[in-house]
Design a protein with these regions (language model features):
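Transmembrane beta-strands of outer-membrane beta-barrel pores
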Residues: 64-68, 79-81, 95-101, 111-113, ...
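Extracellular/periplasm-exposed beta-strand and loop segments of Gram-negative cell-envelope proteins
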Residues: 96, 133-143, 148-163, 194-202, ...
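Outer-membrane beta-barrel translocator/channel fold
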Residues: 114-162, 325-346, 428-447, 460
Length: 460
């Protein structure tokens, strides 16, 4: 008996020592594995699905790539580390591919210090990333507002973006900050190749270097930027502003003819539709500067360590808001230089980053170095479901010169559809749009990042 008792004590002691020596990463893997074991029970189907698509440290990553390239499916690894000096870090690594052989892979790290003191009440935030993406279809109709569908061509595009950005919220007189200094420096390594679509000509069959600057030769770019973001809430939280003023510089090597500068002014206004919306809708809004990478939602908390993201649930009250946005982008190229066509913004359908602009037109329909957009949208939940109805109106134009951006001759588009905000899952949207003289367009999109997390570095 004594030997058995001694063996039992030794076994328990060994188990305790192993548990104590278990790393946090292995502990997270163990918890996720235990959660996945419950997938066999029908009553646990919802929890199983959230573990598969939101679980940490590993989950299946799903999200749309650029328009016409499909939905990428792959794996994501999410980790985090807390330091004794109040610094916090999160790490994301993911890779995914689509049915047309397009793909994206990247690593992302967020680092921030807990807020405190008189200098800041919201933590400074640093975002390091390296992302590569290969798209087998990007459409090109030419430059400017007056191109025709007859010049529809396609090309393949690959780009690596490696860099870091920073956001430093500033507090005045000890109050919660309403503005932040933002800056970044990126290395951009683009590459253009012939289109492979059977029914659409390749870009080099209709366009040349003079009509598509940068077609014959692509160079690496050093791309710093600096700016100011303002995010005050006015009239007792009746209007939430999110303004960005940003200067970007794209430097090619030596005296590259593709170097240019860009100014962006983005003015976004959010108006909750009711007092209840202010309480519940805004509580679920993404932070201005999220602490999570594109695959994580750890900071939102959760009792289940294997699924720290918000759980899918029914809305407690009717929720909704109005969004009004004005966006201006102007590019400046020196004498003898030009903006590469693949870095010019587009309107029509969705752009390379999946942003809807002038949805009734084909994707990438109008392209130019200068852009002006007016957008209004209303989104409201349907009953208590995590589904919302969306209505939108766009007025937009592109220009080849700054003088082309005037308040006339806009293209317009009207849209209606549904959105799905289900816990931490990527937002899903379905939009039917019409307007203009080129028919209608249906747009379906799955956000490339989990709801409430950080976006990925823009492709242009």
């Amino acid at each position: 008996m004594r030997k058995r008792a001694l063996c039992f004590v030794l076994a328990c002691s060994t188990a305790i020592c192993i548990a104590q020596n278990e790393s946090r990463f292995h502990s997270d893997l163990r918890r996720e594995g235990e959660a996945l074991k419950e997938c066999g029970a029908i009553s646990r189907v919802e929890d199983c699905g959230q573990t598969v698509f939101l679980g940490q440290p590993l989950h299946i990553a799903v999200g749309s790539l650029a328009p016409d390239n499909g939905v990428a499916v792959g794996l994501a690894l999410v980790e985090h580390k807390n330091f004794a000096n109040e610094w916090r870090t999160s790490f994301n690594v993911d890779a995914g591919a689509t049915m047309n052989n397009s793909w994206r892979a990247g690593g992302y790290m967020k680092a921030f210090k807990l807020s405190g003191g008189n200098t800041y009440h919201v933590a400074p935030l640093f975002y390091l990333y390296s992302q590569s993406i290969s798209l087998n279809r990007v459409d090109y109709f030419g430059l400017g507002q007056n191109t025709t569908p007859l010049n529809h061509t396609t090309f393949g595009f690959t780009e690596n973006i490696t860099g870091v950005n920073a956001a430093i919220p500033i507090s005045v007189h000890g109050q919660a900050p309403i503005f932040a200094i933002v800056a970044e420096i990126n290395g951009r390594f683009p590459s253009v190749r012939r289109g492979v679509e059977k029914n659409i000509p390749s870009i080099d069959s209709l366009f040349t270097e003079s009509t598509a600057p940068g077609l014959n030769h692509q160079t690496a770019f050093v791309q710093p930027s600096e700016g100011l973001r303002l995010f005050p809430a006015l009239f007792k939280d009746g209007i939430r502003l999110n303004y960005l003023l940003q200067f970007q510089q794209f430097f090619g090597p030596g005296d590259s003819v593709y170097s240019f500068r860009r100014f962006n002014a983005d003015f976004d206004h959010e108006i909750p539709l009711s007092v209840l919306s202010k309480k519940y809708y805004n509580a679920g809004r993404a932070a201005v500067f999220p602490h999570n990478g594109p695959d994580g939602c750890t900071s939102t908390g959760g009792e289940n360590k294997a699924i720290p993201c918000p759980q899918v649930s029914l809305t407690r009250k009717l929720e909704g808001s109005i969004h009004l946005r004005v966006f201006l982008s102007e590019s400046f190229a020196g004498k003898g230089s030009s903006v590469p066509f693949y870095f010019s913004p587009t309107i029509g359908g969705s752009d390379l980053d999946g942003t809807h602009m002038l949805g009734s037109y084909p994707d990438y329909r109008f392209r130019g170095p200068d852009l002006l957009l007016f957008r209004g949208s209303v989104e409201h939940s349907l009953g208590k479901l995590p589904i919302g109805a969306l209505f939108s109106v766009d007025e937009a134009k592109v220009g080849l010169r700054r003088g082309d951006i005037s308040l006339d001759h806009f293209r317009h588009s009207f849209g209606a559809g549904l959105t799905v905000h289900a816990g931490g899952l990527p937002m899903i949207s379905f939009l039917y749009t019409r307007g203009g003289n080129e028919g209608t367009h249906a747009i379906a999109n799955i956000s490339p990042a989990l709801l409430g997390s950080s976006g990925r570095p823009p492709l242009f």
